[in-house]
């Protein structure tokens, strides 16, 4: 089975809720967001709009970040297709960051996650 997420961009109001819930779920440190929300102004006054585009890890079918990893620390779970990192194998070379087409890979040299003591959220 392969997981996916559908986002109705017409309903996105740029509240950053997806970004914050992802941050809480994964316990990332300050300044690290696995999800980002891009915004861009379009049109001219008085009909200006500002559409929002959530950018998440798309867990690619053939992830370039996994192929780029020299130690095999980046891998794909066979049961659900999600991309993950084995922190024990990671040497911190950051080639996965360079290879990610969505710029959604981050390096965290601090093992203690910002929300690490809370565990995963129930949803």
Language model segments and positions:
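Non-ligating segments of multi-cofactor redox enzymes
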Residues: 1-123
């Amino acid at each position: 089975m392969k997981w996916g997420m559908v986002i109705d961009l017409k309903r996105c109001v740029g509240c950053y809720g997806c970004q914050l819930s992802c941050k809480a779920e994964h316990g990332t440190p300050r300044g690290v967001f696995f999800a980002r929300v891009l915004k861009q102004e379009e049109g001219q006054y008085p009909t200006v709009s500002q559409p929002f585009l959530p950018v998440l890890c798309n867990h690619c079918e053939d992830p370039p970040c996994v192929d780029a990893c020299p130690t095999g620390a980046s891998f794909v779970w066979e049961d659900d297709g999600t991309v993950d990192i084995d922190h024990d194998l990671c040497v911190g070379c950051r080639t996965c960051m360079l290879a990610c087409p969505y710029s959604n890979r981050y390096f965290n040299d601090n093992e203690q996650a910002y929300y690490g003591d809370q565990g995963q959220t129930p949803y």
